[in-house]
Structures are given as C-alpha cells and as structure tokens.
Amino acid sequence: MSLKNAMTADFLRSAYGGESMAHIRYLVWAESAEKNGFPNIGRLFRAISYAEWVHARNHFNVLKDQVGDATVAAGGVFGLTNIVENLQGAFDGEVHEIDQMYPVYLETARFQEEKDAERSFHYALSAEKEHAKLFKKAQDLAKQDKDTDNSKIYVCPICGFTVEEEAPEKCPICGVKKDLFKEF
C-alpha cells in the first residue's frame, strides 16, 4: 500500500530518524556499560538497540514508495557520561516517544487511514513501553552500583518487543512465535 498523506510520511521520516539515532546511541552506551563493569546493562542496551533498529526498519519499509531526498528532523539525547545518566537519557527518550511522539503519530495515521503506518507506529509505541520499564529497572540497580541479573534478553524481530529471561510463546504485540525471537 502506498502512502497518500504527506503528514503521515513526515511523521514516519521523523520516527525513522529518531529510532536510527537511538539504535546507534544505545550501542555506544552498551560499550561504555561493558567497559565500566556492567556487562548485563550492556547486553540490555544492545538488545534494545536491535529493537530500535526493528522500528526504524519498519518505518523505512512503510516509506518504500517515497523516493528522493528528505531532511529528517528528529530529537535525540546526546552525551556519554556515566551509567546512571546514560540510563536516564535512555528512559527519558522512551518516555518522550510513549507520552508525546507516538500517540500523535498513531492517531494521525489512523485518521488518515494509513494502515501500514498505523501498524508500524503501534508496534513501536507498544514496545517502547517495555523498553522504558527495563531501563528504569536497570537504572535503579546502577544507582546502587549493581548490574542487572538478566542472563538472556529476547527481542521480537517484527515489532521490537523486548523481554528478559524467556521469550513468550507468542509476542503479545504482533503474535510472532517464540522461536523467531532474537536472543541477546
């Protein structure tokens, strides 16, 4: 299905830019966490980085018929300080997407009857809620100079849903089967 509405296309481009930056930022913060003795928080950053890549890929795929150059305006958290501040930046970014960005984008796509964009925004919004919880939990431990105790993290390759320890039988967001989840 081809996009018909410029506003939804602009929102997809903006979300693509933001998710792409989050993907790289989380990889940088993963390296920092690992170098500073927090290997499991590093794993969490890597897993959620992959989830952000999934979101960016989904948004990009909806834009497949939008050929040409475009300037993408997307906000992003910058800085590489310490584990607690990096986790706060990650949490704040997720909360911004949950409370401000994706609800507007989702309602606009719904109103404009852009079903593919609506699905992409729904997947991202739903997954970001889990990401925020995971970052907050990790930050609470890091404030006590403790690493998380996750031995495995699983990410849905379709919607970016992220869960610790064991993947569900099917993704609660998109329904994909457990055996397709990527393990970190």
Ranges and model annotations:
Residues 1-184:
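Non-heme di-metal
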